[in-house]
Amino acid sequence: MTTSPTTISTTTAATTTTTTPGKGTDSPMVYIEAMLFSMLVLILLIIVCAGYVHVKNLYYRSRYGVTAIYQQVEAECRGVSLGRSVDEPPYQSIYMPD
């Protein structure tokens, strides 16, 4: 006993439309492609977040960390005040007051 695909015919005025029901499931390749694409997006998101944190840490280290302290010490040894104009009053030194 063989079954053939079911066709539905609709006739209105002068138009005849024949519709055949589609397959109920997609091929597994569609699911695999969707999963691989979402994994790729997730990996790229992780890389971007790690890069952002790395750049932020470099900024903080150069602004407030050891590098900034060395720059301040070198500037004080040379007698230069970093980021200040000549007319401003003296600023707080990084050294302990006497």
From Swiss-Prot:
Keywords: Host membrane, Membrane, Transmembrane, Transmembrane helix. One of its GO terms (cellular component) is host cell membrane. Residues 1-21 have a biased composition (Low complexity). It is found in: Host membrane. Residues 1-26 are annotated as: Disordered. It is a single-pass membrane protein. This is Uncharacterized gene 28 protein. It comes from Equine herpesvirus 2 (strain 86/87) (EHV-2). The gene is 28.
